[in-house]
Amino acid sequence: MTKEDILDIAKEIAPNVDWENGTSLMDDGKVDSFDVVGIAGELMDRYDIEITADDVEPENWNSIDAIYNLVQRKLEED
């Protein structure tokens, strides 16, 4: 898994978001709960991880780096 993989998933689910440059995407309302649910679902399927409601915090979804770090933590939990 790479950040590029995460970026590809995010762009597929929410193509109108500036994922490359965003640092507070959820806080700024550029990423909504529907985007998060779609991305989380794809990440869970692809990487066999569990993303819970507790993980749906802006600090986990504000940028590609944040999403990547979330997935890394989840992979390490297994």
Give a label for each model feature.
Residues 35:
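Two-component histidine kinase catalytic core, primarily the HATPase_c
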Residues 54-76:
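C-terminal structural segments of small proteins and small subunits
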Residues 1-18, 69-78:
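Thiotemplate assembly-line natural product biosynthesis machinery
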Residues 11-30, 49-57, 75:
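Phosphopantetheine carrier-protein modules
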